């Protein structure tokens, strides 16, 4: 089904973002199913365990049961910082230690609750989050510039160099 509500599986999530889901569910049947909301951390618990992604906006999608929706109960830890720590080698090693399953790994919620998280001061967390935000901004900018460059190369081949240069000047304002 090409139309409908996107269904996010573990394979569709990574620490840098969400890939476009290949599976969509019927709007009518799944109308009332809960959707992930802004400031939620998606955390994989089955298959590729321990991948976290922080949502900066509400998501009109349904997630697999293999993905937990984590919400912050207090302000002691910033969600962006927690997501970064969840994706760190420190937590990956804990996940590898805890996860069981001979074919598909399963990380139990009770084990996830016991994960040790290094907690920095709020100021240090904020500094890290600001750097992380800049990193994502520059990553997105580089992707956009790369797309512009690809299009400009096609314009050089199809038309001429001056058309491509004009396009790049306009696109990078």
Protein language model regions, located:
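Acidic, low-complexity, intrinsically disordered peripheral segments
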Residues: 159-172
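Low-complexity, Lys/Gly-biased intrinsically disordered segments
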Residues: 1-14
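Short, charged beta-turn/beta-strand-edge "cap" motif at the junction between a beta-strand
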Residues: 47-51
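Sequence-specific dsDNA recognition surfaces
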Residues: 11-38
